[in-house]
Amino acid sequence: GGNSRGLLALSSRQGMHRFGWMFAYGLRRSDFFKLKKTDVFFTNSFTQGFQSLVNEINGKPKFIVLEDDYPSISDSLKKNNFDLIYVKNDSNIEDNIKNAIIKFNPDFLAISVVQWIDGILIDNNFLKSLKLEYKNLTIIADGTQFCGTCNFNFENSPFDVLISSGYKWMLAGYGIAFVLIKNNF
């Protein structure tokens, strides 16, 4: 309907702007990551941003998550009693993810772009191929270990949402994080 821009209701987006998800600072970030300035929000950490985001998701969707991924991902999803499908994080990570998608038909893939435990970078081309093949799959990414390491165009990425703490490679210090949301979410 008219009040929705995808899964996240317009009122939720407006609330994010009112309650600390500072819009003005998003202007520069939008240029840096190549996205619309209205799709950038700020929060104090990845964990807070992710938890706030998943609190807005209704129903009981299925999420694919990686074993040993950043604990805030699975912890936040468990708190909301979502169905979690754990995928083994090993040398066959891409096959493991794709096989789980085929078998379980999840609504979401929640994943760190770079795994915090071993530094494995998830291939964006692999994720793009998943988005092309599985049109209803929504990808939410933790970009904390990734953002700032290379050029990144959010609009051309496979991610529907990317959340990143700024303390890692963005040199922002603790207490600064950002949420990038595509219009279809």
Regions found by a protein language model. Name each.
Residues 1-24, 31:
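A glycine-/small-polar-enriched, mobile loop at the entrance of the PLP active site in fold-type I
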Residues 17-29, 35-61, 71-73:
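Conserved beta-loop-alpha segment that forms the PLP phosphate-binding cup at the N-terminus of a helix
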Residues 44-47, 65-82, 90-95:
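Substrate-binding/gating loop at the entrance of the active-site cleft, primarily
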Residues 72, 116-119, 170-171:
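Short glycine-rich, flexible loops that bind phosphorylated cofactors or substrates
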Residues 81, 105, 135, 158-160:
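Residue-level detector of structured alpha->beta connecting loops
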Residues 93-144:
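Active-site phosphate-binding strand-loop segment of PLP-dependent enzymes
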Residues 157-185:
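Active-site PLP attachment segment
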